[in-house]
């Protein structure tokens, strides 16, 4: 079994931002040389998430609206008593997956027709990192 690890780094420009990262993750899978296995993708931040869904603008906006209804920006969170102001970002990250594991088949991500990988940022405007770990077998 082989394990290959790389990190994605980028800057988010908005407090709340969905970043389509499928092409970058696919490139890491190709560079790994792994033919069959799994690709683990996880943000290295507690106010962010990784999820798989359709890359359609209306749906992305709907996800944001849904998350804001479930975890609105609100000054009354107990977390804010510590001097922080991002409790809603922590809660939104909990509602989406903190990480995802994707199948790798024949050296490529094995995604459905409309499946795409996203980094979801809820406390942005700074440099961010995502770990991508590909594990599996290399066929000769």
What residue spans do the PLM features occupy?
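Active-site histidine-anchored catalytic micro-motif
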Residues: 1-140
